[in-house]
C-alpha cells in the first residue's frame, strides 16, 4: 500500500493545508509521498515538496498541471486540500478521470458541501434545522429579510476566510465587498445569541460513525481564522458538556446530513446550539488535521488514535 498526499493549493487556506499535511505525514501508517500545489497552481514534487512543507508556504511551483507523477505507483491518493479547487470536487474529478481511489467525498458531494447556500437548501428540504440565511450574488441587490446581527460569508470558502459579523444594516455592503473578494456568491446568516458551537466528526462511507461531540469556546467576536489556527486562542472541550439527549440529537443530525449530502470517507459537521435548539452550520468534507484541529481530536477522544484514523480513511477509499 502506497499513498500520495496532495497538499497546498491555490485557495486562501494554502498554509492550513500544509500544516495539516505535516501531521498526516507524521502519523500515516503507510508509505507516503508528498506533492504540493503552489499558490500559482504549479506543482512541487519530491524534495522540493518537502522543502515547501518545511517552509509552510509554496508561492511558486515547478510543474504545470498535470504533474509528471508515476500515478500507477500509488494505491490511494489523499487530497488534503482545503477550500476552492481542492475541497469543491475539482481535484476529485481529476482523480476520477485517472481512475485512482482517493480519500474523502466524491465530486458531487464535495461541490455541494463546499457551497454554503446549496448545501443549506438540500439540508432544509430534508428536514435538518439550519440557521435562517439568504444568498446574495455579486452585482445583485442585497435583500436581507431579517434584522442584524448577522454573518456575511463567501459561499465557497472555509476556515472563516472572508467572514464578517455585521451589527448594523449600513455595514452590510462593506461586508459583502469583502466576501466577494473570494467568491461571486455570499450568504448572509442570522447570528444566534447566546450560542454555543459544537462539532462532531463522521467516519465511513454509506453508513457513517459519529465521534463524541466537542465544543469550541473562545473570546473573539466569532470563530475566525486567527482563533482557529493560533494555539491558545480557543478552548476545545471533548466531550462537550451536554445533556445526553442533546448529544444524541447532534450525532443523529450529523449522520443524517452526511447521508443526505452523499458524503463518503470523512466530514467534520459543525452545529450551533441556541436556546435549546440545535442548528447545523456546515459540513467540511476535508477537515483540518493540524495540531489544533478538532477532527482527529474528536476521534481520539472516542478511542480512535490518529494513525488508526488515517489507516481507516485510506481503507475506506478502497471500498
Swiss-Prot record:
Q: Which cellular component appears as one GO term in the record?
A: cytosol
| Entries under InterPro entries matching the protein | ATP-grasp, ATP_grasp_subdomain_1, D-Ala_lig_Van_CS, D_ala_D_ala, Dala_Dala_lig_C, Dala_Dala_lig_N, PreATP-grasp_dom_sf
Q: Key word Transport present in the record?
A: no
What are the GO BP annotations of this UniProt entry? cell wall organization; peptidoglycan biosynthetic process; regulation of cell shape
* Record domain ATP-grasp: where: 120-315
Cofactor remark from the record: Binds 2 magnesium or manganese ions per subunit.
- What's in the keyword line of the UniProt record? ATP-binding, Cell shape, Cell wall biogenesis/degradation, Cytoplasm, Ligase, Magnesium, Manganese, Metal-binding, Nucleotide-binding, Peptidoglycan synthesis
Where in the cell? Cytoplasm
Ligand binding (Mg(2+) 2): 282, 284
UniProt cofactor(s): Mg(2+); Mn(2+)
- Which top EC class applies here? ligase
**Is Nucleotide-binding found in the keyword set?**
yes
- What residues bind Mg(2+) 1, as annotated? 270, 282
* Known catalytic reactions: 2 D-alanine + ATP = D-alanyl-D-alanine + ADP + phosphate + H(+)
What are the binding positions for ATP in this chain? 147-198
**Which superkingdom, per the lineage?**
Bacteria
Biological or metabolic pathway of the protein: Cell wall biogenesis; peptidoglycan biosynthesis
User: What Enzyme Commission number(s) does the record list for this chain?
Assistant: 6.3.2.4
Any one GO MF term held by the record is: metal ion binding
Q: What PANTHER family does its record include?
A: D-ALANINE--D-ALANINE LIGASE, D-ALANINE--D-ALANINE LIGASE A
Its job: Cell wall formation.
Q: Which family does it belong to?
A: Belongs to the D-alanine--D-alanine ligase family.
The record ties this protein, via HAMAP family, to: Dala_Dala_lig
Q: Name it.
A: D-alanine--D-alanine ligase
Q: Which organism is it from?
A: Thermus thermophilus (strain ATCC BAA-163 / DSM 7039 / HB27)
Q: Which gene encodes it?
A: ddl
Amino acid at each position: 500500500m502506497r499513498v500520495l498526499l496532495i497538499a497546498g493549493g491555490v485557495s486562501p487556506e494554502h498554509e492550513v493545508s500544509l500544516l495539516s499535511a505535516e501531521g498526516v505525514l507524521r502519523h500515516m501508517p503507510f508509505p507516503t509521498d508528498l506533492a504540493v500545489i503552489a499558490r500559482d497552481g504549479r506543482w512541487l514534487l519530491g524534495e522540493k515538496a518537502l522543502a515547501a512543507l518545511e517552509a509552510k508556504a509554496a508561492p511558486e511551483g515547478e510543474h504545470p498541471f498535470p504533474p509528471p507523477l508515476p500515478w500507477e505507483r500509488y494505491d490511494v491518493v489523499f487530497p488534503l486540500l482545503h477550500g476552492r479547487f481542492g475541497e469543491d470536487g475539482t481535484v476529485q474529478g481529476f482523480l476520477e478521470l485517472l481512475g485512482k481511489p482517493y480519500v474523502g467525498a466524491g465530486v458531487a458531494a464535495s461541490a455541494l458541501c463546499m457551497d454554503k447556500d446549496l448545501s443549506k437548501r438540500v439540508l432544509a428540504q430534508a428536514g435538518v434545522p439550519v440557521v435562517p440565511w439568504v444568498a446574495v450574488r455579486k452585482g445583485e441587490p442585497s435583500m436581507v429579510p431579517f434584522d442584524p446581527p448577522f454573518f456575511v460569508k463567501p459561499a465557497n470558502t472555509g476556515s472563516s476566510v472572508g467572514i464578517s459579523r455585521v451589527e448594523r444594516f449600513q455595514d452590510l455592503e462593506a461586508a459583502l465587498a469583502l466576501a466577494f473578494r473570494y467568491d461571486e456568491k455570499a450568504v448572509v446568516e442570522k447570528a444566534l445569541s447566546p450560542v454555543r458551537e459544537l462539532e462532531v466528526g463522521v467516519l465511513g462511507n454509506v453508513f457513517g460513525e459519529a465521534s463524541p461531540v466537542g465544543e469550541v469556546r473562545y473570546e473573539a467576536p466569532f470563530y475566525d481564522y486567527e482563533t482557529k489556527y493560533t494555539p491558545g486562542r480557543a478552548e476545545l472541550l471533548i466531550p462537550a458538556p451536554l445533556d445526553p439527549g442533546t448529544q444524541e440529537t447532534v450525532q443523529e443530525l450529523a449522520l443524517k446530513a452526511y447521508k443526505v449530502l452523499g458524503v463518503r470517507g470523512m466530514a467534520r459537521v459543525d452545529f450551533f446550539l441556541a436556546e435549546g435548539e440545535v442548528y447545523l452550520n456546515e459540513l467540511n468534507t476535508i477537515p483540518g488535521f493540524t495540531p489544533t484541529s478538532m477532527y482527529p481530536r474528536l476521534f481520539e477522544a472516542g478511542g480512535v488514535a490518529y494513525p488508526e484514523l488515517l489507516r481507516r480513511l485510506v481503507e475506506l477509499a478502497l471500498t
